[in-house]
Amino acid sequence: MSEEELLARIAWFYYHDGLTQGDIGDLLGLSRLKVSRLLEKGRQSGVIRVQINSRYEGCLALEDTLQKHFSLKQVRVLPALANMNLSARLGVGAAHLLMALIEPQQLLAVGFGETTMCALQHLSGFISSQQIRLVTLSGGVGPYMTGIGQLDAACSINIIPAPLRASTAQVAETFRQESSVRDVLLAACAADIAIVGIGAVNQQQQATIMRSGYISGGEQLMFGRKGAVGDILGYFMRADGELVEDMQIHQELIGISMPELKTIPTVIGVAGGEEKAEAIIAALNGQYINGLVTEEQTARVMLNLLR
């Protein structure tokens, strides 16, 4: 590991994860004095500013490998750190990436999920100052409120006024034909950048779509038996990235479709945890996302699965 990469890891742990210099020294096998000197060197050299100004903000070798394998436009792999809130850390990483990509007054489309909502929380001031417009990618107001509820009241936000999932395909189609719903769906398709979470079938009760009550435990087991490994916006994918066929839920969803998601120029998937590795690969295989924010251990598991 080069000194610059070591410095960037130390800076991330210190400024974003709140570890003490002693904790970082124990984690990396360095003395507290060495950690302190590297932080000071980083500040003097300009590597450390308000943000971590370094190409080693993530884990460069893993980023390069994933970028080349999947032809990604953007990829960030955060350094592994045990016993920290992974969704919050990924949210910070995603927020930093979006701040570097999105231009003033552009339209950002957002999918539901704990990690994407963490990113929105960290983007709150940036969204206001840059006059970024927001639109949701799916129905279901509840799953979005932990992120949208933190934004300035003056922010431009278009929310699909419908549930994520209707009781039948016919009811879902009726919702989609309502002008108030249709107009937001059209706006979502015209977004400049999108950020989405990736769910894993093996998450069990932890998945947002389950915790929000949109699918049952029995349905999740059935989806797994049909070959599903994960989902984006409630659309379930096989390991090869193809959508699982004959899934009633796909006709009952209210939101943009996967082909429509692919028309958005930049779609960033944000997900981490070893249990999500296969689902992330499926999303990449299906080319539903062309950017990724994840963490080091997840990336290593992904690469092992690809061998």
UniProtKB/Swiss-Prot annotation:
A GO cellular component annotation in the UniProt record: cytoplasm
Entries under InterPro entries matching the protein: HTH_CRP, NagB/RpiA_transferase-like, SorC_transcr_regulators, Sugar-bd_dom_put, WH-like_DNA-bd_sf
Annotated GO biological process: regulation of DNA-templated transcription
Entry function: Transcriptional regulator that represses the expression of the lsr operon in the absence of the quorum-sensing signaling molecule autoinducer 2 (AI-2). It also represses the expression of the lsrRK operon. Acts by binding to the intergenic region between the lsr operon and lsrR. In the presence of phosphorylated autoinducer-2 (phospho-AI-2), LsrR is inactivated, leading to the transcription of the genes.
Residues forming coiled coils: none
Gene3D superfamilies: 3.40.50.1360, Winged helix-like DNA-binding domain superfamily/Winged helix DNA-binding domain
Record family assignment: Belongs to the SorC transcriptional regulatory family.
Name recorded for this polypeptide: Transcriptional regulator LsrR
Record's keyword terms, sorted: Cytoplasm, DNA-binding, Repressor, Transcription, Transcription regulation
Residue spans binding DNA: 21-44
Localisation per UniProt entry: Cytoplasm
Name of the gene this protein is made from: lsrR
Regulation: Inactivated by phosphorylated autoinducer-2 (phospho-AI-2). Phospho-AI-2 acts by binding to LsrR, which is then unable to bind to the promoter regions, allowing the transcription of the target genes.
Repressor found in the keyword field: yes
